[in-house]
UniProtKB/Swiss-Prot annotation:
Residues 1-20 form the signal peptide. Keywords: Cell adhesion impairing toxin, Disulfide bond, Glycoprotein, Hemostasis impairing toxin, Platelet aggregation inhibiting toxin, Secreted, Signal, Toxin. Disulfide bonds join 305-387, 345-369, 347-352, 403-422, 414-432, 416-427, 426-449, 440-446, 445-470, 458-477. GO terms for biological process: proteolysis. Residues 21-191 form a propeptide. This is Zinc metalloproteinase homolog-disintegrin albolatin. Residues 400-484 form the Disintegrin domain. It comes from Trimeresurus albolabris (White-lipped pit viper). The function of this complete protein has not been studied, but it may be similar to the function of the disintegrin domain. A recombinant protein of this domain (409-484) inhibits collagen-induced human platelet aggregation, without having effect on ADP-induced aggregation. It may act either by blocking the binding of fibrinogen to the platelet receptor GPIIb/GPIIIa (ITGA2B/ITGB3) or by blocking the binding of collagen to the integrin alpha-2/beta-1 complex (ITGA2/ITGB1).
């Protein structure tokens, strides 16, 4: 394992709190001004990286000291990530930029087990973190020769439209004859990890809205993808950005006021064009179009591995990439086959990702209903999940491994997160090695840190699909993948 570089940022609160200001996130009614002072504890003679693998921030929120830990999201990009745009004569231009030293991070607040964070450190600190159940945003103030940042609650951002926005997918309300299990009862870490290799496309209206600035558009896409990884981590789904495409000279599929027509045309373009030149699992269209009937997005249901229907469309909100990410997470949920939440569904927040009415305050949580449906039904459907098993191998991840980030990487036996959060007795959170006497730490064929006996059914058949059985040599349940 590498030595994790610890960087301390002291954020000193400015002598006043602002009452109102226009920021990139919108018009903010109440905010704190802080000045990040970076103090780096590097060994003498060591070379500082441009973007460290791990950082620590110490600052105050409402006078309360907090510690924010950040780790680079090393699973943000797939190994063969590409970017495509078009010349004035319509010629496709595709490049394969180096993305190893990127500036997008996940994190958490110390001593707050419920906290999450998604931060860009490209030009100052920009993103959001959750503290004591409240969502806070941080972003740099655009002042000359100043390191000032604003910190504010999401609820203090003036909303663009107080009217409820709707998801365009209908007839997908959650129903089940099975009792709803609490999240803690699902034992979700034992599910096999899957990977959605995702392409994001920015349409021509979005291109003109950003004044043709392809770099800014790409940065927004990276922020959205970074947020998606946070949302899908509880399901053990990695969302890997495998490509971006910007329709710089005009739309390549029909984009109209009708979300249904736009979705259908986009799916046809994917099957006809994109799939023939770029291997991927799902593609999402970011559009500047404001659809009829206050629809914020549209996606096909139970369509993840379908050549035409594994698509979604989402309206772009220029100032709020975290809001766009929330709505894209909702659409991806439908692609996987997850239904809208019913009245009995809960996630411990005001709204959940699969709520039919899109809240102005985004949620980064799936409800107990969504997690139950995923663990009890969706993972057994080969037609909506088979394409998600070809996750890039551990050796394909180009950045160094970090113990404690929940992802199994080269040199690790297990990774149950930071020591303060790890609840797996089979895994030593400080070394990411198995504890003495343990054979495994997770998997459908792992019980009490030991391999389950050979021949034990680990995945019960659904319909004509055969049972899968443990081998007695691994904690993983082999996917046989055939009908009997």
């Amino acid at each position: 394992m590498i030595q994790v570089l610890l960087v301390t940022i002291c954020l000193a609160v400015f002598p006043y709190q602002g009452s109102s200001i226009i920021l990139e996130s919108g018009n903010v009614n109440d905010y704190e001004v802080v000045y990040p002072e970076k103090v780096t504890a590097l060994p003498k003679g060591a070379v500082q990286q441009k973007y460290e693998d791990a950082m620590q921030y110490e600052f105050k929120v409402n006078g309360e000291p907090v510690v924010l830990y950040l780790e680079k999201n090393k699973e943000l990009f797939s190994e063969n990530y590409s970017e495509t745009h078009y010349s004035l004569d319509g010629r496709e231009i595709t490049t394969y930029p180096s993305v190893e030293d990127h500036c997008y991070y996940h994190g958490r607040i110390q001593n707050d087990a419920d906290s999450t964070a998604s931060i860009s450190a490209c030009n100052g600190l920009k993103g959001h973190f959750k503290l004591r159940g409240k969502t806070y945003l941080i972003e740099p103030l655009k002042l000359p020769n100043s390191e000032a940042h604003a910190v504010f609650k999401y609820e203090n951002v003036e909303k663009e439209d107080e009217a409820p926005q709707m998801c365009g997918v209908t007839e997908t309300n959650w129903e089940s004859d099975l009792p709803i299990k609490k999240t803690s009862q699902l034992n979700l870490p034992l599910l096999e990890k899957r990977c959605i290799e995702l392409v994001m496309v920015a349409d021509h209206r979005m291109y003109t809205k950003y004044d043709g600035d392809k770099t800014e558009i790409s940065s927004k896409i990276y922020e959205i993808a970074n947020n998606l990884n946070v949302d899908y981590r509880p399901m053990k789904i990695r969302v890997a950005l495998i490509g971006t495409e910007i329709w710089s000279t005009g739309n390549l599929s029909k984009v109209t006021l009708s979300a249904d027509e736009t979705l259908d045309s986009f799916g046809e373009w994917r099957e006809r064009d994109l799939l023939k030149r770029k291997s991927h699992d799902n593609v999402q269209l970011l559009t500047g179009m404001i659809f009829n009937e206050k629809i914020e997005g549209r996606a096909y249901n139970k369509s993840m591995c379908d050549p035409k229907r594994s698509v979604g469309i989402v309206r772009d909100h220029r100032t709020r990439p975290h809001l766009v990410a929330n709505r894209m997470a909702h659409g991806l949920g439908h692609n996987l086959g997850i239904h809208h939440d019913g009245d009995s569904c809960s996630c411990g927040a005001n709204s959940c990702i699969m709520s039919a009415t899109v809240s102005n305050e985004p949620s980064s949580r799936f409800s107990d209903c969504s997690l139950n449906q995923y663990s009890n039904d969706i993972i057994y459907n080969p037609w909506t999940s088979y394409c998600l098993y070809n996750e890039p191998s551990k050796t394909d991840i180009v950045s160094p491994p970090v113990c404690g980030n929940y992802y199994l990487e080269v040199g690790e036996d297990c990774d149950c997160g930071p020591p303060a959060n790890c609840q797996n007795p089979c895994c030593d959170a400080t070394t990411c090695k198995l504890t003495p006497g343990s054979q495994c730490a997770e998997g459908l064929c792992c019980a009490q840190c030991k391999f389950i006996e050979e021949g034990t059914v680990c995945r019960v058949a659904k319909g004509d699909w055969n049972d899968d059985h443990c081998t007695g040599q691994s904690g993983d349940c082999p996917w046989i993948g055939y009908y009997g």
